[in-house]
Amino acid sequence: VAGEMAQPFDTEQLLKMMFGAPPHPPMRCAQPAGDEVLALDRVSSPGGRSGLVDCSITVRRGEVVGLAGLEGSGQEVFLRVAAGLKPLQAGSVRLSGQALSENDYHAFNRRGVYFVPSARLEEGLIPELTITEHAALLQERRTLRVPYPAAAEDAGRRIESFRIKGRPRTPVEELSGGNQQRLLLSFLPPDPALLLLENPTRGLDLESVNWVWRHLHSYCRRGTAIVFSSPELDEILMVADRVLVFFNGRIILDVAAAETDVQNLGSAIAGKV
């Protein structure tokens, strides 16, 4: 029992009792939107419960865009289409004004697009490999010889810089969810054009959630566009500049986060706009 309260209830005090801290005010990046980074023009693609249907949207440098909707409503397909991981049935994708509609993550990646999946161990990291071994996979080399000493030093730097609670020889499955996410974020380059993230704070404690968003907002201040999905509407409103609501594979609401609230987003998620 963390506390007790009699009516009338104070919402802020209840949240403090439940989570150990009062609710956080908006921590949006609020960067002026720059040039076009990503543009989808009438894109349709299969997947999930409803796929993605006739989607047209533009994302600009420095924007943080949150994707809301029931699971399977199109958010995951949208992110994977934007990353070059899913084929198109119709439409086209532009990156910084250049058409790039082939289903090829490496081609998108060469243009500064990076995708961080929700399934950290299933898609993001390799179970049974250590932090050092992950660092070794990232290093450029001209021979088949694995540069373990250099990789161990690199792993140590990542652990220190990202405050990961682990050691270079720690297998990644032994890390907590928050530390797995910190490790994944440590693999990103310093200046991506576009970051696409599925549920980046899934299962994390409040301290880790705040750390993740402080880190991600440091990218948008350098001009990176960020698009992320989350089932938590409060989180989306706290950190995003703009919200896209998906319903049955379509974007049915595109609104500035400062101009909406949980009730309006909830209605849109139910298809009521």
Q: What is each residue range found by the language model?
A:
Residues 1-273:
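Glycine-rich phosphate-binding loops of nucleotide-dependent enzymes
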